[in-house]
């Protein structure tokens, strides 16, 4: 039995049993706990959940997108990754350039109105096609604001900061781990108090701290808000992957990924799905392969990252709260 996965299942059950009933921005409602933590020993295996299928291709393409410093969804769509579609789509339908059917509250309406769901899909397909094939449209509606990749790779400085106009936090982090591994300042942040609150979806995983001890590199990530059924399994795998990649490029073995979450919630319309997941058996965790020929964190491609021996229960679909 995997303690890595069991702690996720145990926490899911605790949220169901003890979580406070809260309203939320999306109008969906949640069961919520505040201040939770899971610790994943990466020597046990790669923590990609097995009680439901988690699509690793989406995780690695999103992380590569972050590491590119990108905040336009075209790269994701080119890799058939639609994780961020809804937030860019919302920007389009709320603009004066949109002339199609009324898309108000499209997230909730598409779940309860079969006819509207078809209309929504038609408009979404138009949007995706335009992002992929129309450069002007991509420039106007493909950006999702000052989030992750943009903040990681090109944090904008102010007039009081000497030197470059932007800070590449990731490049600096790699240098710091190599040169001052005992530093307590091995930090990567994605929360800018000035610009982040105005983003379509303000950063959820906001702070990461790396830690070197006994020849191993560990990582703790603080997440202000965790959608426990849909989002958190991706976050666990994504930051475990990031830890593996940074360790490979700095000469360390991997240690622990420590996941600390503020508002840890299960949406009311995910309760049936996570209850189904809790009834399923676990399988042995898979292994991660990284191409050892890659010499820079920024040179990895989709083909350089693979998951091996992944055996899981089937996927469980659930609506995204937007």
From Swiss-Prot:
Assembly information from the UniProt record: Homodimer.
InterPro entries xref list: Thymidate_synth/dCMP_Mease, Thymidate_synth/dCMP_Mease_dom, Thymidate_synth/dCMP_Mease_sf, Thymidylate_synthase
Name the record gives this protein: Thymidylate synthase
GO MF annotation list: thymidylate synthase activity
Catalyzed chemical reaction(s): dUMP + (6R)-5,10-methylene-5,6,7,8-tetrahydrofolate = 7,8-dihydrofolate + dTMP
Subcellular location: Cytoplasm
EC number(s) on file: 2.1.1.45
A single cellular component GO annotation: cytosol
PANTHER family: THYMIDYLATE SYNTHASE (PTHR11548:SF9), THYMIDYLATE SYNTHASE 1 (PTHR11548)
Protein's organism: Leuconostoc mesenteroides subsp. mesenteroides (strain ATCC 8293 / DSM 20343 / BCRC 11652 / CCM 1803 / JCM 6124 / NCDO 523 / NBRC 100496 / NCIMB 8023 / NCTC 12954 / NRRL B-1118 / 37Y)
Highest taxon above the source species: Bacteria
Recorded family membership: Belongs to the thymidylate synthase family. Bacterial-type ThyA subfamily.
CDD domains reported for this sequence: TS_Pyrimidine_HMase (cd00351)
Catalytic EC class: transferase
Keyword Cytoplasm: yes
Job description of the protein: Catalyzes the reductive methylation of 2'-deoxyuridine-5'-monophosphate (dUMP) to 2'-deoxythymidine-5'-monophosphate (dTMP) while utilizing 5,10-methylenetetrahydrofolate (mTHF) as the methyl donor and reductant in the reaction, yielding dihydrofolate (DHF) as a by-product. This enzymatic reaction provides an intracellular de novo source of dTMP, an essential precursor for DNA biosynthesis.
Pathway: Pyrimidine metabolism; dTTP biosynthesis
Positions contributing to (6R)-5,10-methylene-5,6,7,8-tetrahydrofolate binding: 227, 321
Entry's Gene Ontology BP terms: dTMP biosynthetic process; dTTP biosynthetic process; methylation
Primary residence: cytoplasm
Active-site residues annotated for this sequence: 204
Key words of the record: Cytoplasm, Methyltransferase, Nucleotide biosynthesis, Transferase
Residues bound to dUMP: 25, 184-185, 224-227, 235, 265-267
Key word Methyltransferase present: yes
């Amino acid at each position: 039995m995997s303690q890595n996965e069991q702690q996720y299942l145990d926490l899911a059950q605790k949220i169901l049993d003890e979580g406070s009933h809260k309203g939320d921005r999306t109008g969906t409602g949640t069961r919520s706990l505040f201040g939770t933590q899971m610790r994943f020993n990466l020597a046990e295996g790669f923590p990609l959940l097995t009680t439901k299928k988690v699509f690793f291709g989406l995780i690695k393409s999103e992380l590569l997108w972050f590491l590119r410093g990108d905040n336009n969804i075209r790269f994701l769509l080119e890799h058939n990754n639609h994780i961020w579609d809804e937030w860019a789509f919302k920007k389009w339908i709320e603009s004066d350039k949109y002339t199609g059917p009324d898309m108000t509250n499209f997230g909730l309406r598409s779940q309860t109105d079969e006819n509207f769901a078809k209309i929504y899909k038609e408009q979404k397909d138009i949007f995706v096609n335009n992002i992929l094939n129309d450069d002007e449209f991509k420039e106007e509606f493909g950006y999702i604001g000052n989030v992750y990749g943009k903040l990681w790779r090109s944090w904008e400085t102010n007039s009081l900061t000497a030197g470059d106009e932007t800070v590449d936090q990731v490049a600096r982090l790699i240098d710091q781990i190599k040169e001052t591994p005992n530093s307590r300042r091995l930090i990567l942040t994605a929360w800018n108090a000035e610009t982040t609150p105005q983003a379509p979806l303000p950063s959820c995983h906001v702070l990461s701290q790396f830690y070197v001890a006994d020849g191993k590199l560990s990582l703790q990530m603080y997440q202000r808000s965790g959608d426990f059924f849909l989002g958190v399994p991706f976050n666990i795998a994504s930051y475990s992957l990031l830890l593996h990649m940074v360790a490979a490029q700095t000469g360390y073995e991997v240690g622990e990924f420590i996941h600390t979450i503020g508002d840890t919630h299960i949406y009311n319309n995910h309760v049936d799905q996570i209850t189904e997941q809790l009834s399923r058996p676990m399988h042995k965790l898979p292994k991660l392969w990284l191409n050892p020929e890659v010499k820079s964190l920024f040179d990895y491609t989709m083909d350089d990252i693979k998951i091996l021996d992944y055996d899981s229960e089937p996927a469980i679909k659930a609506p995204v709260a937007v």
